[in-house]
């Protein structure tokens, strides 16, 4: 009877695995701006990273760099040339490459558009799309597989998204937009954010992530997070996913999960992993993997 018993238990395991109704969580490593940090943060449990992108006077993406001020207990000056970083990121997210990290499924580009005007934002979006096409997506031929979020701090720079989308369409690679999502990170009111997305050509719930947060040096409540979660879960909302930044205290992580977020941006991904393994959370949440589409609202 050993074989039938083992078979039964195996079948039950498959049923349980297939019926996993826990919310997938994106553990988002913050301020990953040098190539070596990709492995560093993934080793700590991150399945997503955030990278800062700065622009030159011609609206061309130049460095992966944050600068001062930045989070407490972090070094603000790590950097790479954008092309170097994108090459490293492509390798880390391309199956078969010796540097491939299958855990890494989502990348947030925090676009430092502060020195761009509303008009040059459009140009910046076009140029950044072309750079991703060339350096990350390898011209559309077996490039990196991670999902990408274009995150912009200023809703007045919505034309960056317009330019980005148009550039991929004009390059006959509109299919790559299936891998691209959008976020405005300036903590504006949600109705204004929705309007900016619509002006950019992004429909409601079209790969929309809504961030809320502040540097880890300052405490911030969860009122706007809860408002975003209500929008996400409503029948007439515009949001697919909600994430909170930047936290690493255990109590803050628990509070964010209890509020219903889909992602947490952090300097200490191992803290998020530890909380997800706690008794009160491991039955409700799990780390997202590549089979979890970040554009699909969890029900």
UniProtKB/Swiss-Prot annotation:
Its EC number is 4.6.1.-. InterPro entries: PLC-like_Pdiesterase_TIM-brl. GO terms for molecular function: lyase activity; metal ion binding; phosphoric diester hydrolase activity; toxin activity. It is found in: Secreted. GO terms for cellular component: extracellular region. The keyword Cell inner membrane does not apply. It catalyses: an N-(acyl)-sphingosylphosphocholine = an N-(acyl)-sphingosyl-1,3-cyclic phosphate + choline; an N-(acyl)-sphingosylphosphoethanolamine = an N-(acyl)-sphingosyl-1,3-cyclic phosphate + ethanolamine; a 1-acyl-sn-glycero-3-phosphocholine = a 1-acyl-sn-glycero-2,3-cyclic phosphate + choline; a 1-acyl-sn-glycero-3-phosphoethanolamine = a 1-acyl-sn-glycero-2,3-cyclic phosphate + ethanolamine. It is an enzyme of class 4 (lyase). Expressed by the venom gland. Keywords: Cytolysis, Dermonecrotic toxin, Disulfide bond, Hemolysis, Hemorrhagic toxin, Hemostasis impairing toxin, Lipid degradation, Lipid metabolism, Lyase, Magnesium, Metal-binding, Secreted, Signal, Toxin, Zymogen. The active site is at residues 30, 66. Mg(2+) binds at residues 50, 52, 110. Its cofactor is Mg(2+). Binds 1 Mg(2+) ion per subunit. Residues 1-18 form the signal peptide. Transmembrane segments: none annotated. It comes from the Eukaryota. One of its GO terms (biological process) is lipid catabolic process. The keyword Cell wall biogenesis/degradation does not apply. Disulfide bonds join 70-76, 72-217. Belongs to the arthropod phospholipase D family. Class II subfamily. Class IIa sub-subfamily. Dermonecrotic toxins cleave the phosphodiester linkage between the phosphate and headgroup of certain phospholipids (sphingolipid and lysolipid substrates), forming an alcohol (often choline) and a cyclic phosphate. This toxin acts on sphingomyelin (SM) with high activity. It may also act on ceramide phosphoethanolamine (CPE), lysophosphatidylcholine (LPC) and lysophosphatidylethanolamine (LPE), but not on lysophosphatidylserine (LPS), and lysophosphatidylglycerol (LPG). It acts by transphosphatidylation, releasing exclusively cyclic phosphate products as second products. This is Dermonecrotic toxin LiSicTox-alphaIVA1. It comes from Loxosceles intermedia (Brown spider).
């Amino acid at each position: 009877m050993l074989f039938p018993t083992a078979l039964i238990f195996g079948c039950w395991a498959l049923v349980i695995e297939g019926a996993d109704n826990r919310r997938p969580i994106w553990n988002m490593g913050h301020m990953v701006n040098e190539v070596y940090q990709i492995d560093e943060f993934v080793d700590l449990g991150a399945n997503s990273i955030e990278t800062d992108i700065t622009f030159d006077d011609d609206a061309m993406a130049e460095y992966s760099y944050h600068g001062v001020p930045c989070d407490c207990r972090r070094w603000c000056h790590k950097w790479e040339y954008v092309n170097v970083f994108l090459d490293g990121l492509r390798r880390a997210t391309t199956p078969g490459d010796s540097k491939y990290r299958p855990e890494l499924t989502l990348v947030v580009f925090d676009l430092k558009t502060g020195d761009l005007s509303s008009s040059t934002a459009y140009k910046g979006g076009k140029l950044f799309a072309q750079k991703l096409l060339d350096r990350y997506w390898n011209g559309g031929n077996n490039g990196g597989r991670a999902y990408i979020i274009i995150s912009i701090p200023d809703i007045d720079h919505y034309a960056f998204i317009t330019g980005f989308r148009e550039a991929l369409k004009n390059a006959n690679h509109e299919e790559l937009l299936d891998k691209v999502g959008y976020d405005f990170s300036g903590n504006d009111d949600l109705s204004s954010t929705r309007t900016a997305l619509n002006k950019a050509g992004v429909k409601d719930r079209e790969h929309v992530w809504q961030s809320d947060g502040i540097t880890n040096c300052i405490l911030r409540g969860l009122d706007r997070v809860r408002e975003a979660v209500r929008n996400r879960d409503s029948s007439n909302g515009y949001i697919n996913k909600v994430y909170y930044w930047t936290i690493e205290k255990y109590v803050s992580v628990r509070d964010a999960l209890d509020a219903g977020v889909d992602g947490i941006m952090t300097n200490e991904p191992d803290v998020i992993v530890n909380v997800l393994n706690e008794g009160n959370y491991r039955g409700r949440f799990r780390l997202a993997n590549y089979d979890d589409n970040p554009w699909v609202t969890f029900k």
